[in-house]
């Protein structure tokens, strides 16, 4: 299912977060995207510290852009990544979930979004988001966890499905033969798929 990356990268870190850089040409990009079989969009911010002001800015920006994307007929993936090396990762997740819920409740009844979130410290932590009527799907990003750790965490969070890139490519090398490369890819797909089925 095709998704279009629409963000222009991250701004400098302030208030414990990195918001997205401005996207002045987003409407033009989305109008061009209508010519292709694109289902939705993706855009990433990063949270490092449990800063109430910083996390509110991240979530507000993500939802503001998401509404713009919905108005053009696409499904937005909202991706406020919590850095896995944060010393206060769970505290970040508590603030993030509360702010996402507030913004979901403000969406029009006929609007839905997808959420792409870092695997949480607490098992089943995002169940309330998974069950929310304005959320189409909650997908998990590996965020730098090893494939094994990411899959283990995913198994403890039923309802989330994998959207791993870093964990997926773990073990791949240009020095591998075609068979070794294909075998590594197959093993990665199998492991991640099984973890998503729990």
Descriptions of predicted regions:
Residues 1, 27-37, 67-73, 105-108, ...:
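Acidic (Asp/Glu)-rich catalytic clusters
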Residues 1-57:
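Active-site beta->alpha loop and helix N-cap motifs at the rims of alpha/beta catalytic domains
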Residues 5, 42-44, 54, 88-121, ...:
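Catalytic beta/alpha-barrel core
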Residues 5-11, 44-48, 79-85, 116-122, ...:
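Active-site beta-loop-alpha junctions enriched in small/polar residues
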Residues 28-31, 57-71, 94-103, 124, ...:
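Alpha-helical scaffolding segments of alpha/beta enzyme cores, especially the outer helices
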Residues 48-61, 88-90, 94, 120-130, ...:
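Active-site-adjacent beta->alpha loops and helix N-cap segments on the catalytic face
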Residues 75-76, 137:
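Short, proline-centered helix/strand-breaking motifs
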Residues 109-198:
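Catalytic-face loop-and-helix region of soluble metabolic enzyme cores
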């Amino acid at each position: 299912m095709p998704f279009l990356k629409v963000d222009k990268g991250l701004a400098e870190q302030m208030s414990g977060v990195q918001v997205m850089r401005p996207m002045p040409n987003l409407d033009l990009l989305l109008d061009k995207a209508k010519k292709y079989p694109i289902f939705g969009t993706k855009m990433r911010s990063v949270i490092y510290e449990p800063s109430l002001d910083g996390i509110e800015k991240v979530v507000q920006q993500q939802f503001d852009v998401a509404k713009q994307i919905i108005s053009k007929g696409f499904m937005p993936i909202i991706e406020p990544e919590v850095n896995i090396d944060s010393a206060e990762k769970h505290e970040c997740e508590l603030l993030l979930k509360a702010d996402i819920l507030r913004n979901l409740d403000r969406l029009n009844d006929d609007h839905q979004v997808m959420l792409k979130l870092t695997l949480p410290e607490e098992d089943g932590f995002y169940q309330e988001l998974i069950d929310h009527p304005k959320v189409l799907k909650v997908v998990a990003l590996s965020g730098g966890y090893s494939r094994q750790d990411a899959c283990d965490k995913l198994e403890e969070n039923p309802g989330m499905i994998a959207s791993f890139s870093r964990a997926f490519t773990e073990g791949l090398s240009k020095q591998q033969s075609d068979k070794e490369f294909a075998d590594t890819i197959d093993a990665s797909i199998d492991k991640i798929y099984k973890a998503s089925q729990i």
